[in-house]
Amino acid sequence: VTLIAEQAVTITEGLSYLRDLMVTYAKRTPVTSVAVLGNAPLGPSDIRAQAIDDSDLVIRVNSFVLDVPGEPRCQGSRADVVVWNRITRPTRFTFDRYRERLYLLAEPMRFHGRPEVWPQSWPPDLGFVPLPNAEILPRIGDELDIPWRAEKLAPTTGFTAAWLAVNLFPECDIRLSGFSFIDDPGQTEWTYQVGGSSPVAPEHRIEAEARVMTDWLKEERVSLWR
């Protein structure tokens, strides 16, 4: 049992297995630092990029972007674990070197009956592991304190990735970056590092996610890299 923001989170057998699987893709073990990247625009910062690349485990989500040689460094160049969903708009990085990464499929709306889709953008031999809704969604919903069952709500993919890092790696430093809703919980539109924008889906409650993330940041081991 770990204490996160004064709330006990029980690490079940399924979540322990998920942690072990994530660790196998880490750059170094034992894992002492985990970086989690959302996709909000980030300006150039060698310090931020280095902190991310120096992390033992780097988790990215959906339409992520990586630093490339010859361009200003912003968000680092590694992706060990990718948490993504079926409606992700792939970037040129999403499935690049996919055989070297762990892909965790977040599909919370399947819990509420949304049909399964298989995007043509996925590599035909893409191996992935679905996140266990039964173990994750109730815990996240309770921590967010939202009527997720009654109103068919779902956490954002970015928050899900951060929740996994904070809760499955309680002994580690957690480095968060690219989460715009922490500073703007009332936003109704996402803007992306890769470019473009989209509306915040109606099933999300980013005000609650911002509140929980702000609570995490009160812990010395959790930091936000703006």
For the regions a protein language model found, what residue spans apply to each?
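Metal-ion/cofactor- or nucleotide/acyl-coenzyme-handling active-site neighborhoods
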Residues: 2-226
